[in-house]
UniProtKB/Swiss-Prot annotation:
GO molecular function: chromatin binding; nuclear thyroid hormone receptor binding
Protein name: General transcription factor IIH subunit 1
Sequence similarity: Belongs to the TFB1 family.
Keyword Acetylation annotated: yes
Keywords: Acetylation, DNA damage, DNA repair, Host-virus interaction, Nucleus, Phosphoprotein, Repeat, Transcription, Transcription regulation, Ubl conjugation
Residues found modified as Phosphoserine: S339, S357
Compartments, as annotated in UniProt: Nucleus
One GO BP: transcription by RNA polymerase II
UniProt superkingdom: Eukaryota
InterPro entries attached to this UniProt entry: BSD_dom, BSD_dom_sf, PH-like_dom_sf, Tfb1/GTF2H1, TFIIH_BTF_p62_N
N6-acetyllysine PTM positions: K240
Subunit structure: Component of the 7-subunit TFIIH core complex composed of XPB/ERCC3, XPD/ERCC2, GTF2H1, GTF2H2, GTF2H3, GTF2H4 and GTF2H5, which is active in NER. The core complex associates with the 3-subunit CDK-activating kinase (CAK) module composed of CCNH/cyclin H, CDK7 and MNAT1 to form the 10-subunit holoenzyme (holo-TFIIH) active in transcription. Interacts with PUF60. (Microbial infection) Interacts with Rift valley fever virus NSs (via OmegaXaV motif); the interaction leads to TFIIH complex proteasomal degradation.
Length: 548
């Protein structure tokens, strides 16, 4: 069943699969089906593996949903609850419409990353052909740690991924087109929906409240485009309008933004106006009565207000994550000039803002010394000094001087006796062994391997070494075998090594044998494989002894 860490988004009971009743589970990363009365899933598909979904036409006796996988397989689910079958099927369909595009982009991104790695690395591409195309190992096993290593390298170069901003004209991309039946069809993509949600949190809140409980996703966006919330003229909103409350929330938010003002003195344009110090000591700026009435009645003011609010929301959508990170720091610096500090108008803060604008870090003097932090995995080993294995006797300086004088006297009186160093028989046998044709000069007359072996054989041998090295790297990484996953992997890697030996190594041996090459070119590869087999045999023997 679902693990404790998995979030279950939707559960639909009375769903048949191959004439067997069960329940359908939609989780954060996969969809699964469990038979009735059992506590395990018999069908489970990751969203990234699903290509598309299909539903049965209206009027059919069976209310069905079909999942089409990238591999070409299909899975059918029959909603058998007569009273709510259509509603439950549509709820599953709408939820899948939201989830599948996210994982589809992720799958496409992984595929692009794999293609990029294969194009940039010819050795990796050849390794892929030798192991995956020849079916020595599966593609999942080949990419298991390749993508992880590449992700680790990329994360080390950049600690965080740059977020994609929001275009100020994203609503202009929603180009209405006539459908030929006195209707309009809007080009609404998942990116535009995400931009709407990030820019207008009130719409996202309405979406969560109504979809799919009160209406379908199609009905929601139809009412969104029909609403005055989407159009420029927002002076009059209907009482039954779903988005009337959103307009009020926007109006309130805009007033809050205006009341906060711009805290950065360098960006505050209103501070450039001359204000007489009359009543209120210059802090009360009340517009004239004649002018305020005309502004309310002017429809152009609503359009300008809408544009200002839209620009502010687009900027705020990109700065929400930055402000959340800045809350953890002591001195946040916001790009729009607004600061969360209440004491922003204090002289010290004002000086800090001015200093930040006129000083450059790269022009200042940096006297700090860069240090490298020591990462101790086992710090307790460094708490005590080294302990000697056995007791040592230290010599004094006088003992060292006396030893030096003694060695010096012996060297001055040394007389070489070369006839006693090596016997004549040993010297004669050594000369014979080092002569041409001797025991130690067997390879002296042989040609180099690059002159004896053709270039195509050399290239194929290099590919074999790279392939067997990759397989052995996976094999030896399983030791010490201390988890069930490693136990399963080491046995699987042994079968992969045997398959490689049969499909790649043996045909190569037969090929060089047909070309009458006397040099055993694959002896070292066979030795490496045999060492791996011996290691696995030793581990299995110890495992059996522990069980008995």
């Amino acid at each position: 069943m679902a693990t404790s860490s998995e979030e279950v988004l939707l559960i639909v009971k009375k769903v048949r699969q191959k004439k067997q009743d069960g329940a359908l589970y939609l989780m954060a990363e996969r969809i699964a089906w469990a038979p009735e009365g059992k506590d395990r899933f018999t069908i489970s598909h990751m969203y990234a593996d699903i290509k598309c979904q299909k539903i049965s036409p209206e009027g059919k006796a069976k209310i069905q949903l079909q999942l089409v996988l990238h591999a070409g397989d299909t899975t059918n689910f029959h909603f058998s609850n007569e009273s709510t079958a259509v509603k439950e099927r549509d709820a599953v369909k709408d939820l899948l419409q939201q989830l599948l595009p996210k994982f589809k982009r992720k799958a496409n991104k992984e595929l692009e990353e794999k293609n990029r790695m294969l194009q940039e690395d010819p050795v990796l591409f050849q390794l892929y052909k030798d192991l995956v195309v020849s079916q020595v190992i599966s593609a999942e096993e080949f990419w298991a740690n390749r993508l992880n290593v590449n992700a680790t390298d990329s994360s080390s170069t950049s600690n965080h991924k740059q977020d994609v901003g929001i275009s100020a004209a994203f609503l202009a991309d929603v180009r209405p087109q006539t459908d030929g039946c006195n209707g309009l069809r809007y080009n609404l993509t998942s990116d535009i929906i995400e931009s709407i949600f990030r820019t207008y949190p009130a719409v996202k809140m309405k979406y969560a409240e109504n979809v799919p409980h009160n209406m379908t996703e199609k009905e929601f966006w139809t009412r969104f485009f029909q609403s005055h919330y989407f159009h420029r003229d927002r002076l009059n909103t209907g009482s039954k309008d779903l988005f009337a409350e959103c307009a009020k929330i926007d109006e309130k938010g805009l007033k809050t933004m205006v009341s906060l003002g711009v805290k950065n003195p360098l960006l505050d344009l209103t501070a450039l106006e001359d204000k007489p110090l009359d009543e209120g000591y210059g802090i009360s700026s009340v517009p004239s009565a004649s002018n305020s009435k005309s502004i309310k009645e002017n429809s152009n003011a609503a359009i300008i207000k809408r544009f200002n609010h839209h620009s502010a929301m687009v900027l705020a959508a990109g700065l929400r994550k930055q402000e959340a990170q800045n809350e953890q720091t002591s001195e946040p610096s916001n790009m729009d000039g607004n600061s969360g500090d209440a004491d922003c108008f204090q002289p010290a803060v004002k000086r800090a803002k001015l200093q930040e604008s006129i000083e450059y870090e790269d022009l200042g003097k940096n006297n700090s010394v860069k240090t490298i932090a020591l990462n101790l995995k086992k710090s307790d080993r460094y708490y005590h000094g080294p302990t000697p294995i056995q007791s040592l006797q230290y010599a004094t300086s006088q003992d060292i001087i006396n030893s030096f004088q003694s060695i010096r006297q012996e060297m001055e009186a040394y007389t070489p006796k070369l006839t006693q160093v090596l016997s004549s028989s040993a010297a004669s046998s050594t000369i014979t062994a080092l002569s041409p044709g001797g025991a130690l000069m067997q390879g002296g007359t042989q040609q180099a391997i690059n002159q004896m072996v053709p270039n195509d054989i050399q290239s194929e041998l290099k590919h074999l070494y790279v392939a067997v090295g990759e397989l052995l790297r996976h094999f030896w990484s399983c030791f010490p075998v201390n988890t069930p996953f490693l136990e399963e992997k080491v046995v699987k890697m042994k079968s992969n090594l045997e398959r490689f030996q049969v499909t790649k190594l043996c045909p190569f041996q037969e090929k060089i044998r047909r070309q009458y090459l006397s040099t055993n070119l694959v002896s070292h590869i066979e030795e490496m494989l045999q060492t791996a087999y011996n290691k696995l045999h030793t581990w299995q023997s110890r495992r059996l002894m522990k069980k008995t």
